[in-house]
Structure formats: C-alpha cells, structure tokens
Curated annotation (Swiss-Prot):
Name this polypeptide is given: Probable alpha-L-glutamate ligase
Residue positions binding Mn(2+) 2: E260, N262
Enzyme Commission number(s) of this protein: 6.3.2.-
Entry binding sites for ATP: K141, E178, Y179, D187, R211, S212, N213
Binding site for Mn(2+) 1: D248, E260
Cofactor(s) needed for function: Mg(2+); Mn(2+)
GO biological process: protein modification process; SOS response; translation
Positions that bind Mg(2+) 1: D248, E260
Domain of life (superkingdom): Bacteria
GO cellular component: cytoplasm
UniProt keyword list: ATP-binding, Ligase, Magnesium, Manganese, Metal-binding, Nucleotide-binding, Protein biosynthesis
Length: 301
C-alpha cells in the first residue's frame, strides 16, 4: 500500500515508529506536513498539492494532527477522504473528539461512566455549578487545553469561585468536574484499535501533582484491566467513531469513568510501559480494513 502520515514533525517518536512498522511490511510511506498541503476543490476533480505539485493517490492516510492545527489538519484529511483515501481515523471523528464538551455529551448519551460535569457562562450560576459537581475540591478544565495545560484543582469553594470567575472574565470556555479522590492522582490509558484494547498503562502523577500526564512528569507502568474497564474503553472509542484511540479512564468507587478520548494517542509511553509493538498493530489494522471510500460518512464530510 501507499501510505501518507499527516505529521508536522517526522522525527517524533510516534511518527518514526509508524514509518518503521509500515516499511518493514513493504509499504511505501510519505510523511506530509498537513500545513504544507493545499487543496483544489472543484466539481470535476478535486486534488491535493504540495510544493507546486499534485500529490499522488494514497491508499490510506494516518492522521497525526496536533490539537493546535485541528481545523486545517482535518480539512486536509477530509480532502483525502473525498478523493478515496482510507483514513485511519476519519476527519469527522477527530473533530468530534477534539471538542471535549461535545465528547462528554455523546458519551453520556450512551450511558458511559463519566465524572459529573458542569458547564455555564454566567457568573450568577457559579454557586449552583459548584454544587452540581459535589462541591470542592473540584477540577476546572479549559476546553482548549492539552497535555494537562489549563487544568486546575480547586481545593476549596473560595478557590473554585475565584478560578471560575477569572476564566469567565477572560471569556474562556471551560468545564467543571467532580474530583475523583479515590483515583489517587492516577489514570489508565487504554489503547484501542478496532474493537479491542491492545495495550494499557497506568499513569501516576508525580508527588504534589494531581495531573498524571507523562508530559507533566507522571510515570507509566503496566496495568491489568478489569472486564468493565476494557468494555468501557472500546465503547467510548466506538461512540466517537474512532478506529484508533487513547481512552483515559479513572478508577472510582462506582466503576470506570472516562476522562477523555484521544484521537492521536502518543505511542512512546505505552510501547515502553507495555513492551508491545503498537505501531505494527496499527499497520495490521490498515492492511485488513483499508478500502477506497470506506468511511462511515462515505467521504461526504
């Protein structure tokens, strides 16, 4: 197969591993910076160009699109879908998963366990918003944040009110969530491919920190999932419409709770923690499933 990987940095661990895994199986791989791709959209024959030349046809596309370039990156991916390339994750599903509030609304509709979450825009609603999620301590998250940036633990009601007022004053979109104390600063990253969890790791926050992101100094270790955790992760990925996803779960006293569904999960932490070849399993999925115009939206966007 001819495979395109949409990535702004060919030297990133995840991108390198996907290239290695694909080439080991005899596939031809090109790493394309989505910001350097541009589109010709017309009624006769749409195309994608780079450096003044039309790109060749790719059998499938692996999107590794950063959160900061979601709009343009998904537009490029959508163009690939329109001309018949099979996307590992579809543009619609990526856009859906990048909207944290929309994701939680979709997951809640399917009855998937979540931390109680509140969303409001007016200062007069702050007291009720805090009560809605069980009072302090509580977690306040900017909707645009990634890798733990823009996530605040407010340990008292006064602190919560101050942070919420500040975010409202800055006209930032944020949500308020109950704090799951029993999780102990740990979460579980489940790597879902198709309808299976193929790898899982426990991420533990460093001392004095509640965010378990590896980018924030958290540590990763192997973890054994319960059947409920496994089923929750698969159902969450399926609800988002993602073929490959990193599903972040908290262990609570009332079962697994989904924190986030990531459409472009990093491979380094989970491959090192589990010693599993995740990249090759992604390529295997493409070999079995990649067919022209085979998308849930039939390439219609």
């Amino acid at each position: 197969m001819r495979i395109a990987i949409l990535s702004r940095n060919a030297s990133l661990y995840s991108t390198r591993r996907l290239v290695e895994a694909a080439e080991e199986r005899g596939h031809e791989v090109d790493v394309l910076n989505p910001l350097r791709c541009y589109m010709n959209i017309n009624a006769r024959e749409s195309s994608i160009h780079k450096h003044g030349k039309e790109l060749p046809h790719y059998d499938c596309v692996i999107p590794r699109i950063g959160a900061s370039v979601t709009f343009y990156g998904t537009a490029v991916l959508r163009q690939f879908e329109m001309i018949g390339s099979y996307p590992l994750n579809e543009s619609v599903a990526i856009s859906r998963s990048r909207d944290k509030l929309r994701s939680l609304q979709l997951l809640s509709r399917k009855g998937i366990g979540l931390p109680t979450t509140g969303f409001a825009s007016q200062p007069q609603d702050i007291p009720d918003l805090i009560d809605m999620v069980g009072g302090a301590p509580l977690v306040i998250k900017l909707l645009e944040g990634t890798q733990g940036i823009g996530v605040v633990l407010a340990e008292t009601r006064q602190a919560a009110e101050s942070v919420i007022e500040a975010f409202m004053g800055l006209h930032s979109n944020f949500m308020v969530q109950e704090y799951i104390k029993e999780a102990g600063g740990a979460d579980i990253r489940c790597l879902v491919i198709g309808d299976k969890v193929i790898a899982a790791m426990k991420r533990q926050a460093k001392a004095g920190e509640f965010r378990s992101n590896l980018h924030r100094g958290g540590s990763a270790s192997l973890v054994k999932l319960t059947p409920a955790e496994r089923a929750t992760a698969v159902k969450a990925a399926k609800t988002m419409g993602l073929n490959v996803a990193g599903v972040d779960i908290l262990r609570s006293n009332h079962g697994p709770l989904v924190m986030e569904v990531n459409s472009s999960p990093g491979l380094e932490g989970i491959e090192q923690a589990t010693e599993k070849d995740v990249a090759s399993q992604i390529i295997t999925f493409l070999e079995k499933n990649a067919k022209a115009h085979k998308t849930r939206t039939k390439g219609q966007g």
